[in-house]
From Swiss-Prot:
It comes from Histophilus somni (strain 129Pt) (Haemophilus somnus). It is found in: Cell inner membrane. HAMAP family: DsbB (MF_00286). One of its GO terms (molecular function) is protein-disulfide reductase activity. Coiled coil: none annotated. This is Disulfide bond formation protein B. Required for disulfide bond formation in some periplasmic proteins. Acts by oxidizing the DsbA protein.
């Protein structure tokens, strides 16, 4: 089974599909913000940046999936983004479940000074909502709970692909199969 996942990681179509899935999630977030008028909070913005990391890893893996260095780089960026996104989403759910005055998220994002995304792209990365508000739900789950499921799936995907990189692929031999 690990050989299947290693071969899967060496195909460009896998990385394109990963890129498209992250692009769809980013587009959906922008539709929720600008189309439906839902105000994103700081944690929503951070989760959006984590999805951008997964999108970026799909782009890197798509460049040359057969090159081990680029494949490992894409896996590391994707795994790091999935872990960070999952941790952020769990913390965001804590803000929604335990609504206390001392359990609040910041109102202004804390981006590095060298990468102030909220200043460069305010229509995308400027928060205007509260982290404890639940403004949307689907099938009984809030948006944050769905984000946890999505990041958990990405995390499992990247873990399996990372482990499969250590599996040696044997050459097909015609004799003595």
């Amino acid at each position: 089974m690990l050989i299947f996942f290693k071969n899967l990681s060496m195909k460009r179509s896998t990385w394109i599909l990963l890129f498209i899935s992250a692009l769809v999630l980013e587009s959906t977030a922008l539709y929720f913000q600008h189309g439906m008028g839902l105000n994103p909070c700081v944690m929503c913005i951070y989760e959006r940046v984590a999805i951008l990391g997964i999108l970026f890893s799909g782009l890197i893996g798509c460049i040359a999936p057969k090159w081990l260095v680029l494949r490992i780089l894409a896996l590391l960026i994707g795994l790091g983004s999935a872990v960070k996104g999952l941790l952020l989403a769990i913390k965001h759910l804590d803000y929604q479940i335990n609504v206390y005055p001392w359990n609040q998220c910041a109102m202004v994002p804390d981006f590095p000074q060298t990468l102030p995304l909220d200043k460069w792209f305010p229509n995308i990365f400027m928060p205007s909502g509260s982290c404890s508000d639940i403004t949307w739900s689907f099938l009984g789950f809030s948006m944050v709970q769905w984000i946890i499921v999505i990041f958990a799936c990405y995390f499992l995907f990247f873990i399996i692909l990372s482990i499969s990189q250590f599996k040696k692929v044997r050459k097909n031999r015609m004799l003595f199969r």
